[in-house]
C-alpha cells in the first residue's frame, strides 16, 4: 500500500514540475518583464516615461564593462590550466620512481 502512496506523490511532483516548466517557457517566450499592453512600466503606474538619451549611453558603457569583466575571467582559467600542467609534470616525475630497474642479461662475452 505504501508503494501506491509513493507513486501518487511522484506523479504529483512530476505534474507540478511539468506545469512549472511550461510556465517558465511561456514567460521566456512572452517576456515576463514586458508589460502586456506594450507601455513602459512607469506609464502603467501613472508616471510619464521620460526619454533620456544619456541613459542609453550608460547602458552601452555597462555592457562594455561586463565584456571586460568576462575577459578577465578568461585569464583566470588560463592560470588554473597552467597550474594543472605543472602538477601533471610533477606526477610524471613520481612515475619514474615506480619503474622497475632493468638488469643487464649476462652473456658469454661478459664472462
UniProtKB/Swiss-Prot annotation:
The keyword Ion transport does not apply. GO terms for biological process: negative regulation of apoptotic process; positive regulation of transcription by RNA polymerase II. It comes from the Eukaryota. Residues 43-81, 90-100 have a biased composition (Acidic residues). GO terms for cellular component: nucleus. It is found in: Nucleus. Keywords: Nucleus. Residues 1-111 are annotated as: Disordered. The keyword Chaperone does not apply. Residues 9-42, 101-111 have a biased composition (Basic and acidic residues). GO terms for molecular function: histone binding. Belongs to the pro/parathymosin family. This is Prothymosin alpha-A. It comes from Xenopus laevis (African clawed frog). The gene is ptma-a.
Amino acid at each position: 500500500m505504501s508503494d501506491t502512496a509513493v507513486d501518487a506523490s511522484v506523479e504529483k511532483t512530476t505534474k507540478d514540475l511539468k506545469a512549472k516548466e511550461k510556465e517558465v517557457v511561456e514567460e521566456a517566450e512572452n517576456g515576463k518583464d514586458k508589460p502586456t499592453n506594450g507601455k513602459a512600466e512607469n506609464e502603467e503606474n501613472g508616471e510619464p516615461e521620460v526619454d533620456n538619451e544619456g541613459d542609453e549611453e550608460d547602458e552601452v558603457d555597462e555592457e562594455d564593462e561586463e565584456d571586460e569583466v568576462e575577459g578577465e575571467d578568461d585569464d583566470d582559467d588560463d592560470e588554473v590550466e597552467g597550474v594543472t600542467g605543472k602538477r601533471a609534470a610533477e606526477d610524471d616525475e613520481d612515475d619514474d620512481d615506480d619503474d622497475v630497474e632493468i638488469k643487464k642479461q649476462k652473456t658469454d662475452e661478459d664472462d
